[in-house]
Amino acid sequence: MREESPSLQGSPLPIRAELRRKEKYQYKQSITNMGNPKAFLTIHRQEAGYRPVHERIDDFSEVEQTLNSSDRRTQASRCMDCGVPFCHWACPLGNKQPEWQDLLYKGRYKEAYHVLEQTDDFPEFTGRVCPALCEKSCVLKLSCDEPVTIRENEAAIVEAAFREGYVQPIQPVRNGKKVAVIGSGPAGLTVANQLNRKGYEVTVFEKDELPGGLLRFGIPNFKLGKHIIDRRIRIMEQEGILFRVNTMVGKEILAKDVVKDFDAVCVAIGAEVPRDLSIEGRHLRGVHFALELLSQQNRILEGIPIPPKSQINCKGKKVLVIGGGDTGSDCVGTANRHGAACVTQIEIMPQPPVGQNPATPWPMYPQVLKTSSSHEEGCIRRWNLASNRFIGEKNNLIGVEVEEVEWVPSPDGGRPQMRQTGKKEIIEADLVFLAMGFLHPEQEGLIKELRLATDNRDNIAVDNAGYTANSNL
């Protein structure tokens, strides 16, 4: 339900402790042996793959395909149930991959889902957009470079759970306490979900038109269809969570009133301030932050009106993306779907090695060259290029002067140092999207109103338990 919440004052709650506790699912059968202990010797890794390029660049539907149930279970059988499961070690959520892979192989989808949801509140999200640290730490990655398709298996389990009706609203026993969650991105939704199931009455405040945060307005639909978010939000609303959208705490509503009206407040507003590129010509028309393009496109697909003069259209344009990460890749895919004349992506750092990197050996997450579905659709990729200035004509962007740089070892053994080479060139561009990462939360509004202390990176200062100086915030 999305509505206003009544006022209630009370005492601070042990919220941190509540977030740590999750119900344990007991298997009907102890898993001591995998169903097919030699499958990894005879069965090769098979990915679902992407839809054909010529088809997918004409729409914003999800690009990743799915395997049939038989093939998916066969892929799950490749898990070796290692004595030391490095997949579990690598997963930030602590997922129990060997357990639910075995259950998937045996066709016990309901049990597999219950094991999965112990550690992952929203596997339908992570099963689509997680970078799959677990797969990079799989022993089969080390031995034959064919890790188990863990991420895809995870997505298959949760989709089967929704399809078969295993995912149902839970009506918890209320404890009489109220909690406000500020922000409805992945962190905010997780906090809301866990506390609601512990009996707290949870209200989520979201500044945008719909819940989801970065999931909704940052990640393109071709990676995460928004019907997936809507499906989960409906479940959460049926469980009693209130969503107040178009409500920016610190602007539309005073932060001090939220603190006063709830027993506890969880701040989950994300690091939304992007890294800027303050060089000559930054003011020119055609220079945008990456999220300006991505959030606008997602709003258009949601049917949210965008003033014509504010719309960014890459059709027939020469597009330059500055920044080589996932956000930059998302800009590439979006520009291609607009019908850009050409798309170039540049990165100031050196090109990562292909395949393996001695600096990040197994089971660490490898710093190697990654080629996304967006790159496959058409993109010129270049490295070791620094941007010197934006070039304009009649206040419109027409190009960017870039300079080749070198990275040399630091004399003190620290990070490599950048050295300019003097080799300059101009890359023609009608549109530039800055995708150089994010810095910290927005300081205006909630942080300033409550005078919250921040650290030297402008993040909210908290103690080891995650609390601010305010005992219930």
What are the language-model segments listed below?
Residues 9, 25-29:
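Low-complexity, intrinsically disordered or signal/transmembrane-proximal segments
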Residues 38-65, 94-106, 111-120, 147-151, ...:
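Beta1-alpha1 glycine-rich phosphate/pyrophosphate-binding loop at the start
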Residues 72:
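Short phosphate-coordinating micro-motif centered on Lys-Gly-acidic
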Residues 173, 178-182, 230-279, 388-409, ...:
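Feature captures the FAD/FMN-dependent oxidoreductase FAD-binding
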Residues 174-184, 315-322:
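Beta1/beta-strand and adjacent pyrophosphate-binding region of the FAD-binding site
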Residues 283-316, 409-473:
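FAD-site-proximal beta/loop scaffold in flavoenzymes
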